């Protein structure tokens, strides 16, 4: 009778398990493929010739060398080694790699060792020493591909973490490059202001001498002194901005403000010319786009993993134990105990929990798919923005240069007319201010062009080779 009951229970268990395995709720998502997006073959605002390329991998490069500035190259090398944001991203990558190794370990059986020692007895009796040693082996075969899906998902997470590392690196390099050129343009502005200050000081001295000699009005002296003070105030403001930019560059280098100093440098900087053929491969080489695609792949694997919740769990176990009474049974053979077993578990009813988890995974996949498309569109926009600015700055450069030449000539003409007694010194001051404003605007435009070049390269993924 008891044997019949056991058989009936076993048959019922098998039936329920098979019912769970064949449930129509178990869905099998299609194999993951990278979404194909419809993109243009050219950029709307491209002045250069652009070509579309095939898939390539993100690789480390030294894109800043296009500026041909040895100090900038040295700073970028320091940044790559000491930047703390980059170190954080590297640590996150190592964490993702460790999680992948953890998932691979789930394919293998686990081995546990256990032991115990006991010393017992009663009053007037011989103490009893007992030692026990055992081993336990368990293994969960990957019948439904759960471990494989988990590994697939974590591999995608690792790839996303690697892309995130590349994105952080590129962003920090861009920040360092932009800050460096901000400082260099401020150096040039300080040089212009210093030369202007010396010129204005000479004018004040000459006008004072003329005023003392009765050859000039006091109003001319006051106007010249006011103009000199304005330039000195601009020097203070410009120096303050340079100090703040230097502080930013110090942090990017992984140093304290006190540990870092960038000497002033008077130099002529030229906006680099990009290669005539630049591929429109930012869709596949931009780190943020790669990260979004890999996150989508990880979510797809998570969706497949959620589907396996309808399938039963199966585990195989083997245990062995050595039991010996060391003192009281010293000359007797120890006792060996062993057992092996097969265990299966199937969840029949959970109140809709598994359906909800699958729905959540599907919604998450939809979200990541939209995020991937958004990353691609954002990439295109950033390139188009940089191209618009590049073209506009180039047109503005020629006009600005003409304006500076006119302002310089006007200053020279008005100065000669003042020396000839034909105009007041107020006109000289006006002409000098126009020349100074034009020269400063020319430098600021150079600054915008240098930063735009770096931004365009970064928008293309940091690789223009």
What are the functions of these language-model segments?
Residues 3-81, 239-284, 326, 458-465:
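Terminal intrinsically disordered/low-complexity segments used for targeting and assembly
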Residues 62, 68-71, 75-78, 87-90, ...:
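Small/polar-residue-enriched beta-strand and adjacent coil segments characteristic
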Residues 75, 82, 89, 140, ...:
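Amphipathic alpha-helical coiled-coil segments and their boundaries
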Residues 85-90, 94-100, 104, 193, ...:
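Long, contiguous alpha-helical "rod/stalk" segments
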Residues 98, 105, 163, 170, ...:
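Regular, well-ordered alpha-helical segments
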Residues 147, 163-278, 389, 413, ...:
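Periplasmic alpha-helical coiled-coil/stalk elements that build and connect Gram-negative outer-membrane
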Residues 211-215, 418-422, 459-463:
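A short glycine-centered flexible hinge/capping loop motif at secondary-structure junctions
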Residues 344, 361, 368, 390-393, ...:
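Hydrophobic, well-ordered secondary-structure elements that form the walls
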């Amino acid at each position: 009778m008891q044997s019949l009951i056991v058989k009936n229970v076993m048959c019922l268990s098998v039936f329920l398990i098979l019912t769970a395995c064949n449930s129509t709720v178990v869905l099998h998502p299609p194999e993951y493929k990278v979404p194909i997006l419809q993109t243009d073959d050219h950029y709307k605002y491209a002045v250069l010739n652009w070509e579309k390329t095939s898939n390539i991998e993100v690789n480390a490069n030294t894109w800043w060398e296009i500026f041909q500035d040895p100090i900038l190259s040295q700073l970028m090398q320091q940044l790559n080694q000491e930047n703390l944001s980059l170190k954080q991203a590297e640590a996150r990558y190592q964490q993702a790699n460790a999680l992948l190794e953890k998932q691979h370990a789930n394919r293998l059986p686990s081995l546990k060792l256990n032991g115990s020692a006991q010393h017992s007895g009663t009053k007037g009796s011989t103490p009893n020493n007992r030692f026990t040693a055992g081993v336990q082996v368990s293994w969960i075969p990957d019948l439904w591909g759960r471990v494989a899906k988990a590994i697939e998902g974590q591999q995608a997470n690792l790839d996303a973490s690697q892309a995130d590392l590349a994105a952080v690196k590129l962003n920090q390099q861009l920040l360092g490059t932009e800050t460096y050129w901000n400082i260099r343009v401020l150096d040039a502005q300080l040089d212009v202001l210093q030369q202007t200050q010396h010129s204005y000081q000479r004018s004040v001295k000459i006008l004072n001498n003329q005023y003392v000699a009765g050859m000039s009005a006091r109003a001319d002296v006051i106007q010249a002194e006011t103009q000199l003070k304005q330039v000195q105030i601009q020097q203070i403001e410009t120096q303050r901005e340079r100090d703040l930019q230097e502080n930013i560059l110090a942090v990017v280098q992984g140093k304290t403000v006190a540990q870092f100093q960038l000497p002033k440098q008077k130099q002529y900087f030229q906006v680099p010319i990009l290669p005539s053929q630049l591929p429109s491969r930012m869709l596949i080489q931009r780190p943020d786009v790669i990260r979004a695609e890999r996150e989508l792949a990880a979510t797809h694997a998570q969706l497949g993993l959620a589907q396996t919740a309808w399938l039963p769990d199966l585990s195989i176990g083997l245990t062995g134990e050595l039991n010996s009474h060391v003192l009281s049974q010293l000359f007797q053979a120890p006792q060996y105990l062993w057992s092996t077993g097969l265990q299966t578990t199937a969840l029949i009813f959970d109140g809709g929990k598994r359906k909800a988890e699958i729905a959540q995974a599907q919604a998450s996949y939809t979200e990541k798919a939209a995020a991937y498309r958004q990353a691609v569109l954002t990439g295109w926009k950033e390139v188009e923005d940089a191209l618009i600015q590049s073209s506009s700055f180039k047109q503005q450069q020629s006009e600005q240069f003409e304006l500076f030449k006119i302002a310089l000539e006007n200053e020279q003409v008005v100065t000669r007319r003042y020396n000839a007694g034909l105009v007041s010194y107020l006109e000289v001051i006006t002409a000098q201010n126009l020349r100074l404003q034009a020269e400063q605007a020319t430098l600021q435009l150079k600054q915008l062009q240098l930063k735009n070049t770096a931004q365009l390269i970064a928008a293309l993924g940091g690789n223009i080779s």
